């Protein structure tokens, strides 16, 4: 059991490591570096880099408890074959046309070196805000009998929250770890976290990393 709001997680008190995964969303060079997509779009990546120690600590305790760690990476094919006209237009509008930003063939696509990725971790590549759209994430989760998801990563208001909403609609039990998520927009970050708890937890529950680690230690 993990102390959380508006209810302790999971709601029925049965937290089973083999049925639980820690999702680490998009902690890539393109989002966290000073020269990547996020910075070139006018956002400060400092808040995103700041969560790395917390995420690393969570991953360490999750693995020790027998919980699967799953990373996601956002990016497109090098030949842009999977990029829609609208996405190409947005890319051009942002001044990124002709660059390798957010392309899978670029260094920026890689997970940051300060992230403690382990060989047993699973990596899911995506092109959309949701890690479920056009990926094999749900198949991986169902194949492993995973029913409970712990959310971390960036950005809170876009890829984390979109994946969270889709997970809830797919009947996964979800917990968002507030201090293990980050955004370049403080208002959007706070709003996204607040939305988790409205209507008695319409998008699951919200906790901090210390509460999660304490709950895992008690298993």
Q: Where does each model-flagged region fall?
A:
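Generic enzyme active-site microenvironment
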Residues: 24, 72, 177
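Short, well-ordered beta-to-alpha junction loops that form the rim of enzyme active sites
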Residues: 72-75, 154
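Short acidic/His/Gly/Ser-rich catalytic and metal-binding motifs that mark active-site loops
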Residues: 30-35, 80-81
